[in-house]
Amino acid sequence: MKKAISIFPKEFGFFPYIFLVYTIMPFLSLLKESGVKQGIGYGMLLLFVAAYRQLFCSVGKASFTYWLIVQMAVILMYSVFYNITYIYLGFFPANFVGYYKEKTNFNRAFCALIFILLFPCLYQFIANSVSLRELFSVLPFLVIMLISPFGIRSMFRRIELEAKLAQANEQIKELSKREERVRIARDLHDTLGHTLSLLTLKSQLIQRLAASDPERTKLEAKEMETSSRSALKQVRELVSDMRTVTITEELVNIQHILRAGNITFQYEGADDFSVISPVTQNIISMCMREAVTNIIKHSKATHCAITISQFADKMRIVIRDDGKGAPKEKMFGNGLWGMEERLMLIEGGLTVSDHNGTVVALTIPLIKKAE
């Protein structure tokens, strides 16, 4: 499959192409020139467009400054030796000056912008090529050109801060998960460690007394049952303290996630999952989230549909998309192994198929929530 040809980097979208419309004005103005001057003018216009393209391709690189100098030099030549109206091309470098993150580089580029905008005006006025009235008509546009670098720089700062904030939030989430794991591990050790050790000792004692002292064996077995019930109660109390996500909540989250990824969402099936235990709902929610994350990251899909069917003894969840599907050798990559491991905890199963997109089917035996 051939890759689509892109003149400008894809991350800038359609914006660079819009600015190219403004090069039509100098192109038409050069038609009034003749001979060598016209040829040089069109040559500089080609160089200007090439520099414009290279500026987008070299953002953050050392060559960015060189191409900006080329663009400014072309504008200076146009507005001094051709016509003052070419100064409107200053909107191009004014945009790129705002790309500088370092204050020193920004100030230098801004001073250069001031020079290429004001020097031609003074030169043409002293040479009596333009009137004071014509200069005043240009003044509002000069002000906009000189203000725009600050606006562009402020916008990029905000984008950078938002990216850092998002990264910090992800780190906070990860730290919260780690803290929760440590807390659970500590609670399990404190609440179950002693009980499980006691059960181990009693099981060893029962093995030795099974033949010689049946009555004592029955008593120890009864105590083991009591201890195991106590351990089960402790586990349930521990789980109840955990923040679990219900299937209904996760469906809402999935809708928001898919909408952010420009993927339409359709849901069919049950809307009441109250009979399903919180632990089972939490595991199902994590599996659904993993499947949807795979769709957004890998499928290039435009639509996702989830169907949940509840039967007397089991639940079936089908997650399908209209994306490119996945190769057979990668079917159980991209987090699907993790989903399968989670489902094993509740005796569930996972199947993945490729039918006009990827189809992920989860089957979970239903264990109703304890009253």
UniProtKB/Swiss-Prot annotation:
Its main location: membrane. GO terms for cellular component: plasma membrane. Keywords: ATP-binding, Cell membrane, Kinase, Membrane, Nucleotide-binding, Phosphoprotein, Transferase, Transmembrane, Transmembrane helix, Two-component regulatory system. It is an enzyme of class 2 (transferase). It catalyses: ATP + protein L-histidine = ADP + protein N-phospho-L-histidine. It is found in: Cell membrane. Residues 32-38, 93-109, 157-371 are cytoplasmic. The modification Phosphohistidine is found at H189. PANTHER family: NITRATE/NITRITE SENSOR PROTEIN NARX-RELATED, SENSOR HISTIDINE KINASE DESK. Residues 1-10, 60-71, 131-135 are extracellular. Residues 187-368 form the Histidine kinase domain. One of its GO terms (molecular function) is ATP binding. It comes from the Bacteria. This is Sensor histidine kinase YvfT. Member of the two-component regulatory system YvfT/YvfU. Probably activates YvfU by phosphorylation. It is a multi-pass membrane protein. CDD domains: HATPase_UhpB-NarQ-NarX-like (cd16917). The chain crosses the membrane at residues 11-31, 39-59, 72-92, 110-130, 136-156. It comes from Bacillus subtilis (strain 168). Pfam families: DesK_N, HATPase_c, HisKA_3. Its EC number is 2.7.13.3.
